[in-house]
Amino acid sequence: MSTSNLFNTVPFGKNVLNHKIVLSPMTRFRADDNGVPLSYMKTFYAQRASVRGTLLVTDAVAICPRTKGFPNVPGIWNKDQIAAWKEVVDEVHSKGSFIWLQLWATGRAADLEALTSQGLKLESSSEVPVAPGEPTPRALDEDEIQQYILDYVQGAKNAVHGAGFDGVEIHGANGFLVDQFLQSSCNRRTDQWGGSIENRSRFGLEITRGVVDAVGHDRVGMKLSPWSTFQGMGTMDDLVPQFEHFITCLREMDIAYLHLANSRWVEEEDPSIRTHPDFHNQTFVQMWGKKRPILLAGGYDPDSARRLVDQTYSDRNNVLVVFGRHYISNPDLPFRLRMGIALQKYNRDTFYIPCSGEGYVDYPFCKEYLDQADEAAVAG
């Protein structure tokens, strides 16, 4: 049995986690055509909640119809969606675990066909495409920006007060709408929403303030990916000062946590060969401090996760490790890591099969876990 700091308890929002292994938010296309979570989703999250005291973060969830930028992604704006999510939340809570919903708006990163089929147009902070040759979005006007802020707030209320989620994570990463305002590689505005570090930060911060006012500071997290070049991001000259300012403002709001992702994407370089001294987010981790949890994501495996908490950040108990792909294929991942049990391999070909349980809910639990199935949940 592991003695790693991975298995220390951690205060988190209004709860206490039994370990530091977190399910990553992942877009898996398992909602129906109307954005209602299918029954597979309840099974998926219940499986990964089976080790008591686990933190799960959901798929990216569209906050309103205009943000449903891909087919078969879930939403949180109507009663059918909220009711389906409540079933998911209740199942996770019955296992003694916790679940936060990720609030999402795609902006220029949406699938154009998915938008046009709904009579919607591509939009962003500025008229800058994701890449040369890609469709050019239109720039949001003042009224539309204010409406987006209200939509985030309503999405948070629907999640926490309607569906019973423990909290919400604002998706400010990976080149989606909040990131499109935050980074000058996309944001070319000259009004109060662009042109300076403070103005580029305004959209994300106004969303955060509104959501905090709606559901409470200890029910709000933020995900950022400063170094990711995915979807045209991560190329601005003043990247570190931009994110230093933004993170400082988030810390002053005393939100529940910060979630940082390293640049580890299919079409990008391995982060180990990137040479910028701040690339692995240590600067931002130090800025965040030790008072509130910080989630770190970036292709971690059992060994690198242990090194992260036992060596790199051994002086703090607030660093949690986010797993995506390994959690797909190992629903009992915290149990396996604690007991030193080998991980099952994942199958990329089944990551994104719409409306299907294949590669989603059919990975088995290990024998050692099943031997304890007479317990309501396994102690984390």
Curated annotation (Swiss-Prot):
Keywords: Flavoprotein, FMN. The keyword Flavoprotein applies. GO terms for molecular function: FMN binding; NADPH dehydrogenase activity. It comes from the Eukaryota. Substrate binds at residues 171, 174, 352. FMN binds at residues 25-27, 60, 102, 171, 223, 299, 324-325. CDD domains: OYE_like_FMN. Gene3D superfamilies: Aldolase class I (3.20.20.70). Belongs to the NADH:flavin oxidoreductase/NADH oxidase family. Probable inactive dehydrogenase; part of the gene cluster that mediates the biosynthesis of fungal ergot alkaloid. DmaW catalyzes the first step of ergot alkaloid biosynthesis by condensing dimethylallyl diphosphate (DMAP) and tryptophan to form 4-dimethylallyl-L-tryptophan. The second step is catalyzed by the methyltransferase easF that methylates 4-dimethylallyl-L-tryptophan in the presence of S-adenosyl-L-methionine, resulting in the formation of 4-dimethylallyl-L-abrine. This is Probable inactive dehydrogenase easA.
